Regions:
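RNA substrate-binding interface of SAM-dependent RNA methyltransferases
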Residues: 1-4, 10, 15, 22, ...
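Active-site/ligand-binding-proximal alpha/beta "capping" segment
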Residues: 156-193
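Alpha-helical elements of the RecA-like P-loop NTPase motor core of helicases
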Residues: 45, 118, 191
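Glycine-rich phosphate-binding loops that contact phosphosugars or nucleotide phosphates
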Residues: 58
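Short glycine- and Lys/Arg-enriched binding-loop motifs that mark or flank ligand-binding interfaces
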Residues: 51, 87, 121, 179, ...
Length: 193
């Protein structure tokens, strides 16, 4: 997924297993030698704050986030998340985006981080597959919406209104580039969006 491993924390039984040695070998091939820390399951649970089901944690360096213009350049369908604060919801949206063929996800600064453990877990790993970036807070919504329209996107809001179109409405079938905007939990989209 393009993330650089920094260190590995694992149970002794995992370090001694064939699978564990295989994983360590693959990491060494790609990234060279990294620090490997070994401890009992109890110590790992205490350090991490949760029970490790697989007995292994890897700290990774975050990639630099792409610019919106680079991310959306060749994309046809994008999702824009406005202040979706619950990591579970962010993960579920990424999983749905992957299933629906969404090419990229843009998140406002008020959104939960897609790399939070809960978001990544609920997404079933799709946060590492669907390209995404975080928008500059100062640019949302006015500048970002102008930029999307300038790039050829039609913007549509996921909102329950009397004049709403169904997602399968024929008016949307021939739209070349579509930006689907989803609002925060509870209140939905802000009035100025």
């Amino acid at each position: 997924a393009g993330y650089e491993p920094l260190s590995l924390l694992m149970e002794q039984r995992e370090a001694d297993s064939e699978k564990g040695r295989e994983i360590l070998g693959r990491i060494a091939e790609v990234s060279g030698e990294i620090p490997v820390y070994v401890a009992s399951n109890e110590v790992l649970s205490e350090i991490s704050g949760f029970k490790l089901a697989r007995g292994m944690l890897c700290a990774m360096r975050r990639r630099a986030l792409p610019k919106m213009e680079d991310l959306c350049g060749n994309a046809r369908r994008i999702a824009v998340l406005e202040n979706v604060v619950n990591p579970t919801n962010v993960g579920a949206i990424f999983r749905s985006a992957a299933a629906l063929g969404i090419d990229a996800v843009l998140l406002t600064g008020g959104c939960s981080d897609p790399l939070y453990r809960r978001a990544a877990r609920v997404s079933m790993g799709t946060v590492f597959q669907v390209p995404w970036t975080i928008l500059e807070t100062k640019d949302w919504p006015e500048h970002t919406m102008k930029q999307l329209r300038k790039m050829g996107y039609h913007t549509v809001a996921m909102a329950l209104k009397e004049d709403s179109l169904r997602p399968d409405d024929e008016k949307l079938h021939n739209v070349e580039k579509l930006a689907i905007i989803l609002g925060t939990e509870g209140e939905g989209l802000a009035a100025d969006t």
